A protein has these predicted regions:
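Glycine/small-residue-rich phosphate/adenosyl-binding loop
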Residues: 1-34
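Aromatic/hydrophobic pocket-lining residues that form π-stacking "cages" and hydrophobic walls in ligand
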Residues: 40-41
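Short hydrophobic alpha-helices that are characteristic scaffold elements of the AMP-binding
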Residues: 46-47
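Short, electropositive alpha-helical surface patch
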Residues: 65-78
Length: 106
């Protein structure tokens, strides 16, 4: 099963950090920026008509995977974006009531 994971899509985009020391941009902000990159890539791919899914998991940051993609030990693979095309129409998701999660203040 593990060996077939890369075959699930014709293209996989790897999102990884490349931490840079900067007194005004701490590592956690750089990590969050990588997450924003992934989300914006998903939006861009969908706008171009592609199907994509952002995956992570226990194998994502193993030394072997990091080495394969040239990600150094101190950096993080934030996700793999599996990308391709499909004629399948995805069903609409049910709208989630955000009132349990969001608090509005004035």
């Amino acid at each position: 099963k593990i060996l077939n994971m890369p075959l699930r899509a014709p293209m996989i985009i790897v999102i990884a950090t490349e931490y840079q020391y900067h007194k005004k941009v701490p590592p956690f902000e750089q990590l969050l920026s990588a997450g924003a990159v992934a989300q914006n890539m998903l939006l861009a791919l969908e706008s171009l008509g592609y199907r994509s899914v952002w995956r992570t998991g226990p194998l994502c940051n193993t030394p072997e995977v990091k080495d394969y993609f040239g990600v150094t030990k101190q950096n993080t693979i934030c996700g793999l974006i599996y990308t391709g095309s499909s004629s399948v129409q995805m069903p609409d998701r049910e709208t989630v009531d955000l009132s349990d999660y969001v608090e509005y203040r004035q």
